[in-house]
Amino acid sequence: MSAMGAGPDHLFNLRNNFYLGAYQTAINNSEIANLSPENAVERDCLVFRSYIALGSYQLVISEIDESAATPLQAVKLLAMYLSTPQNKESTISSLKEWLADSTIGNNDTLRLIAGIIFMHEEDYNETLKHTHAGGTMDLYALNVQIFIKMHRAEYAEKQLRVMQQIDEDHTLTQLASAWLNLAVGGSKIQEAYLIFEDFSEKYPMTCLILNGKAVCCMQMGNFDEAETLLLEALNKDAKDPETLANLVVCSLHVGKSSSRHLSQLKLSHPEHILVKRVSSAEDNFERAVQLVA
C-alpha cells in the first residue's frame, strides 16, 4: 500500500500509473532495481492488480503460489472472486477466514481487498468493518468511495480531510476530491472537471481520466463534449466497462441508439451494475406485459 513515510518513493510512478488507469504502462515499467523486500511485494501487488484490471484473472491465479506473502495471496483472492462469480461464496468464505486470523487479519492489503470485494457485493457495512480504520491512502480513498455509494457525503468528506492532511497533492487525494465533488454536484462539478483536466495535462490520457472528464461534462449538460471524450476512451479500450456504461447514458441524451454499447457491456461485463439494473427493468416490464395480456 502507499507508503506515507519519508525517503525516496521508488514506486511513485508505478503507483501513479495504476491509480490513473494506465495499467499496461504500470506492467511494462515495473522492473525497478534495489527495492526492499516490502517494496518488492507492493510492486508485485500493483502489477498483479493491473493485470486484474485488464481482465487477466487466470494469469494472476496461476502466477501467485501458496508460498507467496499475504498481500499477494489477497490479490489472488480478488482475481478468483472476479473470474468465477458462480464460486464467489467459497472465495468470500476464505476471505472471512483470513480476516478472522489474528496473525494476518490486520494486513493493509488484505483489508483493502476485503473492502473491494464487499463493495462489489454492495455490503457496505461489512466493507467498513475492515476499512474504516484506514491507515493507508488506498484505504482512505476506498472509504471515500464507500461513503459516496452510501450517500453519506459528510463522512466521505471526513476521510478526504484525513487524506489532505497526509498529502494534499497525492493522486488518490485528488481523485477522491473529484469523486466527492461529483457526488455533491452543483458548482463542485467544475472543480471535479478541473482535477481531471489537470491529470490530462500532466499524464498520458487514460480511460479513467477521459471518463472522469466525460461524467463532469454530462453533469454540466455538455453531452456532445462528453460523447467525444467517451468515444476517445472507447478507441483506447473497446471493452472498458465504465466507458460503455457512460456511453449508454450519453447516447440516450444525444438521441442516439445505445443498444450496441449495452450489448457489448452485457457480453464483456455481465455483473456490471448497469446491466443488472437494465435486466431488472426488463424483467419487470415482461411481468407487467404478462399481467396485462
From Swiss-Prot:
GO process annotations (BP): protein transport; retrograde vesicle-mediated transport, Golgi to endoplasmic reticulum
Primary location recorded for the protein, binned into one broad class: cytoplasm
Subcellular localization(s) per the UniProt record: Cytoplasm; Golgi apparatus membrane; Cytoplasmic vesicle, COPI-coated vesicle membrane
Any one Pfam family match given in the protein's UniProt record, by short name: Coatomer_E
Keyword Nucleus: no
Entry annotated with the keyword Membrane: yes
Name of the protein: Coatomer subunit epsilon-2
Source organism of this protein record: Arabidopsis thaliana (Mouse-ear cress)
